[in-house]
Amino acid sequence: MSQEIISEIKNHTGIITLKTEDGLNAVSRRMLAEIAEAATAMDMNDKVKAIIIRGGEKAFSTGIDVNEFVADVNPSVLEEMYENFEKIADVKKPVIAAVSGYALGIGFEMALACDIVFASESACFGHPDLSLGTIPGFGATQRLPNTVGKSKMMEMILTGRAMNAREAERTGIVSRIIPLRYLFDEAFNTAERIAALPDLAVNTSKELIKTAISNTNLEEGLEIEKQVYKSSIASDEFRQNLANLAKK
């Protein structure tokens, strides 16, 4: 198993921990594939009833691995990453995100793709992609409006302004704010409470709720977002901005 994630099962809960050496949990191609593989395996495991995705104290994830993107950005890599991200988003069992510190870019989008989000007081959510000359590429433009509404979404995406835990709770991105020392325990206890309920009722309820809040043209919207994202990251402006960021 990679050093970038830890996958384990405790009682009836699958636990996926993002764990890079620097604690920032930048999402590489390999990390995303391994998260998707672990989540899919847990979804198919009859013992597992709910899944937790968590990072560390400093960050849930600071976003895409910039150095990897500078070295290797091409359509086939992106398509693979899209497929793996959607495997995470399409898990049928309830998924809980336990967020401490930064959840930026694809890290923010991964939290949005989860069903319940618990956050510590230090959590910070944002999407700085436009400053690089590109757009959110993994579902934020389609999933965020269902959570925060048009005006708040426009401000976050168009200005890149980050949102702290309190604001995220008020706008519905976060279910509850939990003191850091209790964050994982509360996520785990919630997962185990879900595990005690009948599988069919839980999983059907999740699917019905997702259907109710989703854009009826979600798949079409995601496809448009994907194509625009591919086009934007192929631009000279994006590549130069990304190279400048990698040098910092």
Protein language model annotation of sequence segments:
Residues I16, T20, E34-I35, I53, ...:
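Terminal peptide-recognition signature
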Residues M1-N11, G160-R166, R181, D185, ...:
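C-terminal alpha-helix plus adjacent terminal tail
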Residues M1-G56:
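Conserved CoA-thioester-binding segment of acyl-CoA-metabolizing enzymes
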Residues L32, V66, M81, T141, ...:
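A general structural signal for well-ordered alpha-helical segments in protein cores
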Residues A89-L200:
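Crotonase-fold acyl-CoA enzyme core
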Residues A33-E37, M44-K47, G55-D90, A103, ...:
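Glycine- (often His-adjacent) and acidic-residue-rich active-site loop
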Residues A26-R29, T62, A71, L158, ...:
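Phosphate-coordinating loops and pocket residues in cytosolic domains that bind phosphorylated ligands
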